[in-house]
Amino acid sequence: MSGHAGAVSDLVDQLSKLPGIGRKSAERLAFHLLRVHEDEALALASAIRRVRTDVRYCSVCYNLSETELCRICSDPKRDATRLCVVEQPRDLLSLDASGVYSGLYHVLLGRIAPLDGITPDQLTIDSLVERVRTGNFSEIIMATNPTVEGDGTSLYLSNLMQEFPVEITRLARGITSGSVLEYANREIIADALTGRQRL
């Protein structure tokens, strides 16, 4: 039971549902929003509404985009012979920020995790297979996170790709096992990309 006014209590409840935000942090954020100028609070509300209404998945790679094709898929300067497979759009951002890779991406929107009830049919694997079948790729880079589920997903995908005349590689192990790509720094990601190994 909260001692806050109804609107404040509702805001704290909603903020505490965000990843990494506990009740105390949610209270601090709520009270901060009460102190800021009204325009600032309304700008935040507008940005949240806009991201929910305007942002969608790219129709080709499943990156986040405000248009049908994301900025990467619509960039003619990208290397269309290499395809890097990642779990989430935030992984794509981390890899692309390294500046080492200039190819295309495919976002799975998750990883195979049977214990969590996540199966291959819940990911964008069918779309990936179709892209490889119809594309002109010479290399597929498995850039799933170095976790049990990420490694399992990479193995599953590499088995699916055996029928295609492409080289299948995996990021080098400069990224610690069990870690997440979005938290790795640019240098580690660059080393993992340049030192990738054949699967």
Swiss-Prot record:
InterPro entries: DNA_Rcmb_RecR, Rcmb_RecR, Rcmb_RecR_Znf, TOPRIM_dom, TOPRIM_RecR. GO terms for biological process: double-strand break repair; recombinational repair. A zinc finger (C4-type) spans 58-73. Residues 81-176 form the Toprim domain. CDD domains: TOPRIM_recR. Keywords: DNA damage, DNA recombination, DNA repair, Metal-binding, Zinc, Zinc-finger. PROSITE patterns: RECR, TOPRIM. It comes from the Bacteria. The keyword Transmembrane does not apply. GO terms for molecular function: DNA binding; zinc ion binding. Belongs to the RecR family. PANTHER family: RECOMBINATION PROTEIN RECR. May play a role in DNA repair. It seems to be involved in an RecBC-independent recombinational process of DNA repair. It may act with RecF and RecO. This is Recombination protein RecR.
